[in-house]
Swiss-Prot record:
Its EC number is 5.6.2.1. Monomer. Its cofactor is Mg(2+). The keyword Zinc-finger applies. SUPFAM superfamilies: Prokaryotic type I DNA topoisomerase, Zinc beta-ribbon. This is DNA topoisomerase 1. Residues 329-354 are annotated as: Disordered. Releases the supercoiling and torsional tension of DNA, which is introduced during the DNA replication and transcription, by transiently cleaving and rejoining one strand of the DNA duplex. Introduces a single-strand break via transesterification at a target site in duplex DNA. The scissile phosphodiester is attacked by the catalytic tyrosine of the enzyme, resulting in the formation of a DNA-(5'-phosphotyrosyl)-enzyme intermediate and the expulsion of a 3'-OH DNA strand. The free DNA strand then undergoes passage around the unbroken strand, thus removing DNA supercoils. The lineage of its organism: Bacteria, Bacillati, Bacillota, Bacilli, Bacillales. It is an enzyme of class 5 (isomerase). It comes from Halalkalibacterium halodurans (strain ATCC BAA-125 / DSM 18197 / FERM 7344 / JCM 9153 / C-125) (Bacillus halodurans). One of its GO terms (cellular component) is chromosome.
Amino acid sequence: MADYLVIVESPAKAKTIGKYLGKKYTVKASMGHVRDLPKSQMGVDIEDEYSPRYITIRGKGPVLKELKSAAKKVKRVYLAADPDREGEAIAWHLAHSLDIDETSECRVVFNEITKQAIKDAFKSPRPINMDLVDAQQARRVLDRLVGYNISPLLWKKVKKGLSAGRVQSVAVKMIIDREKEIQAFEPEEYWSIQGTFALDGEPFEAKFYGTNGKKVELKSEDDVNNVLAKLKGDQFHVDSVQKKERKRNPVSPFTTSSLQQEAARKLNFRAKKTMMLAQQLYEGIDLGKEGTVGLITYMRTDSTRISDTAKAETKEYIESKFGKEYAQNGTKAVKKDKKSQDAHEAIRPTSVERDPKSLKEYLSRDQLRLYKLIWERLVASQMAPAIMDTMTVDLSNEGVLFRATGSKVKFPGFMKVYIEGNDEGKKEEDRLLPNLQEGQTVTKEEIEPSQHFTQPPPRYTEARLVKTMEELGIGRPSTYAPTLDTIQKRGYVALDERRFVPTELGEIVLELMTEFFPEILDVEFTAKMEDDLDSIEEGKQQWIKIIDDFYKGFEERLKVAEEEMKEVEIKDEPTGEMCEKCGHEMVYKMGRYGKFMACSNFPDCRNTKPIVKEIGVKCPKCEKGEIVERKSKKRRVFYGCNQYPECDFVSWDKPIARSCPKCSSYLVEKRTKKQVQVQCSSCDYKEEAN
């Protein structure tokens, strides 16, 4: 019979840890939180210093019964939930439910699930950290005070099922503010002049820079013509050649935020999916003869540091695989963000020796892709900087200056393993110039002016929104993914081509929130609240005072809102179409994900239809219907025939009104981030989109 009981959150984690601890230990899972505030009432006693009234979560009774029974049979119980606020709170609730003294050495924490980390953790158990618990409790109580008071108000004044929260409301505001910027944007005209030149028949490109040594902006076609009129002949003089060596340093290992951003950019993963896969890699994967192994460190962190052991192992790996010149020389200082809690390491593989190829047969495709990203990022972070040779050349003709820039990799360093992605999806390539020297003459081959217009700021992608939230101090590693998930589930925003757009419902709710609860939407207020929660965790402030300072002002605004907030009637709009089932008029209604079409004879007729957008292309299958843009249940855009179900044509890619010149099948637009290519739906024909 076992002497010790270890309680973790999940069966996967229990299985991995159980393998390392041996027969004297029984490892069981609590399946997450066992106690929480009740759903049916506020659960916070405002008169009794905001005391939370916790109850056993529905369905957790049998779990607690099993844990209590197991606890009675052992000498000692260890609580080994995750090493953060949420994990500390789970441990505290378990201690309360199992009558364990929270001041006893019952808490065990580890940053990775490996044999050595588990052994070390069990050598130094500690009491439950009540500062961590209080920080989690303060967040929970704050969110309950806001949500439980404002949500019913929104149900009453707008529609049922709505909710309001501190962080989610600010995220919605950011998306709506960006949409307003886009709508208010007035494009400005500007021009550029691209020149193709040649030295001894070797072509290269340069851009117009200015005149008489000064930079000049081209605002109109007249400006362009004035510049071109100055040029005489095809010969340009090489005025200057500047050659420099530039170092490019590797990026740090992943934090939660940077992992979500990079997985979105490189793998097209949503934040929620990234965290689900990371959790699986952290809790343990069955590696055959090796058994179940935790492959990465804890995935909720805002730290970029790694342990000395991990540094040494990674350096040794780099030297053996790439050579000593590729290993980082000296210790790179880790810049600590003032918002970083830094309680953990960065996200890294638990062993750099487990390269992605060695795990291919044990991981799913998406698990492997995410692991590869994490592994490459760690290795690259400990490698030498890349060294680039850069060259800047100025060419002139009658005082008209063109500038050419080139670069090539002299020493790849970390770039041999990993290059960070960017939101535009552009690939970095060498830009090579001929071996130009001052005083030489080059020949102009072509001059091509181009008209451009300034572009509005882009809508937020998940990656960009997470990055901006992090920069502003809104939310913490554990809250980014749930926040993005919630604002979509509530129907306040939707994703259009992987970018957030506000819904009419989101705009209505934000307008009410702005009028009656402006402080909840204030970025600085929300960021300060996060800092206050951090200070509670550090033992510098009492959680009750933080809550009280917030609630005094909030309570006053709540009273005003209850009296003055007017009901918002979201009226049905006529569509001009008749219901094909009963003959009544179809109307536009507001639903969870925005507008849809429904019969005005509801509830007698329950006919509903999505709002579809014709794209001006005949159906290539039945040749009778029109192709329309639709959205799947997961909000992904696809294209189908408007004669469905008679015609079942469907395509994820947008068909265009041309046939393939090679096989006569229909052509589609294939989108990859910002690149659009025309491809055949049947054969290998491709062409660049105009």
